[in-house]
């Protein structure tokens, strides 16, 4: 176990423990990794001076290693509990550093499939903690993710209730990046509710703000996808195809195979609906489509052949 030691010795002990963690990971000693990570995470610094940059880095590293291990092993409950447990343990961390740790773990957990109800509960837990600790920016980040989760669970009114307050607050704080993300979720919710005018208005707001800041490729692909869906709803399939193609290229460049395949399906749909079945068949038979052949593409092929005939 880690013992209490004066100042720099505390950070040195944590650093040595992290080295042991890395070695245990290489040797696939799961039990040892969990034990060592928990020791580093749970031990308290003797004084505020002991929690220096090296000590914080060691605790942060141990947290990430443990979280990734839980994710790889499918220990979702343990991953969720880890996020709850570190809140009081890391309360003396620099605010920006703690926010980074919470965001990183939360984003990792968001990738878990089939556990949306638990993720909603976790979101509410973290939001309540943020309110108590006056961490408004972190709260708004988690609220954006929560709204997206509620959208996926088809709890559209609950999502809109959060988004209406959130977008108003984000506009006042001029957090443009998060405003883009929240308004994109809003557009998806209205689209699911078949309220095309509001879905389009939210998307227009997204693009207006996005034009003034740098948008990461993954978010840009999501914006393009939403643009394609709305264009398709308006039966402008030529424009829809161009957006779906941009989405496809974006996901393909990021090696997001499943998402690229999803957008490829919509590319084919647009060509077929635009009465260009020959183009759809050419895409299906092209070298670029080999990675994305599945039952959905096969179904599109049958439709294209039927239309051609």
Predicted feature residues:
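Extended alpha-helical scaffold regions
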Residues: 1-309
């Amino acid at each position: 176990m880690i013992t209490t030691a004066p100042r720099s010795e505390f950070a040195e002990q944590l650093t040595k423990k992290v080295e042991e963690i890395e070695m245990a990971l290489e040797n696939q000693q799961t039990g040892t990794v969990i034990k060592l990570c928990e020791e580093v995470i749970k031990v308290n610094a003797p004084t505020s001076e002991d929690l220096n940059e090296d000590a914080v880095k060691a605790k942060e590293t141990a947290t990430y290693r443990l979280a990734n291990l839980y994710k790889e092993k499918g220990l979702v409950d343990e991953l969720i509990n880890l996020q709850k447990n570190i809140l009081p343990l890391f309360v003396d961390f620099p605010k920006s550093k703690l926010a980074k740790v919470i965001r990183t773990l939360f984003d990792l957990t968001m990738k878990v499939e089939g556990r949306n109800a638990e993720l909603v509960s976790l979101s509410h837990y973290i939001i309540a903690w943020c309110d108590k600790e006056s961490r408004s920016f972190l709260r708004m980040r988690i609220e954006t993710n929560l709204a997206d989760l509620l959208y996926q669970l088809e709890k559209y009114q609950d999502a809109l209730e959060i988004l209406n307050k959130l977008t108003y607050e984000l506009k006042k704080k001029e957090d443009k990046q998060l405003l883009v993300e929240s308004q994109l979720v809003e557009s998806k919710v209205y689209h699911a509710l078949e309220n095309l005018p509001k879905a389009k208005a939210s998307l227009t707001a997204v693009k207006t703000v996005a034009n003034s800041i740098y948008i990461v490729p993954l978010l840009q692909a999501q914006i393009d996808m939403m643009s394609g869906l709305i264009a398709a709803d308006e039966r402008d399939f030529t424009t829809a195809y161009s957006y779906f193609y941009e989405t496809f290229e974006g996901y393909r460049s990021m090696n997001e195979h499943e998402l690229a395949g999803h957008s490829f399906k919509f590319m084919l749909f647009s060509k077929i609906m635009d009465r260009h079945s020959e183009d759809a068949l050419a895409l299906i038979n092209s070298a670029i489509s080999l990675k994305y052949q599945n039952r959905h593409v096969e179904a599109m092929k049958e439709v294209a052949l039927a239309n051609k005939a």
